[in-house]
């Protein structure tokens, strides 16, 4: 989030459709086994993660997601700065929730920051995921080329900070 001031009301949509991606079915997904730091010169093959925010660790590391079927996710670019509530309203409550297994599946296709559906220019790619207690959170991932890994953060969907233009949001 970038602290962009509140804009004047507009009839322009917040989201511009970019595309869809297929996410394979996932077995039971144990978050603390997958979302682990793995970056720098000693990085092992696989997804490189350089940072997990304190909120992410508190809200998600103890979570286990049950098996999920194959899914198609949509992603869209923000055309103007937006709050989570504004993004979620445009996505629609029935389509907003994704899973950490789905996020990780996307990261696995771009394990070292190569081009793909996730942004790799340090800008956030946003997902809405229920935490270990079922509370919906904004989970964002962005690539840090300096550290050679993904930054994974979590925020309250009630945050007063706006996501900047050009960020992307995923939904079902």
Model regions and ranges:
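A binding-site-centric feature that preferentially detects glycan-recognition modules on secreted/surface proteins
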Residues: 1-95, 102-172
């Amino acid at each position: 989030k970038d602290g962009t001031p509140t804009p004047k009301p507009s009839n322009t949509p917040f989201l511009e459709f970019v595309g869809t991606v297929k996410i394979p079915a996932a077995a039971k997904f144990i978050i603390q086994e997958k979302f682990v730091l793995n970056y720098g010169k000693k990085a092992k093959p696989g997804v490189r993660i350089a940072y997990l925010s304190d909120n992410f660790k508190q809200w998600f590391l103890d979570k286990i997601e049950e098996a999920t079927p194959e899914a198609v996710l949509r992603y869209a670019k923000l055309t103007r700065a937006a709050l989570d509530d504004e993004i979620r309203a445009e996505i629609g409550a029935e389509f907003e929730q994704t899973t950490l297994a789905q996020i990780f599946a996307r990261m696995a296709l771009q394990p070292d920051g190569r081009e793909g559906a996730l942004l790799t220019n340090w800008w956030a790619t946003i997902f809405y995921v229920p935490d270990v207690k079922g509370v919906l959170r904004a989970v964002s991932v962005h690539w840090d080329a300096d550290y050679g890994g993904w930054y994974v953060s979590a925020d309250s969907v009630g945050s007063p900070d706006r996501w900047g233009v050009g960020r992307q949001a995923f939904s079902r």
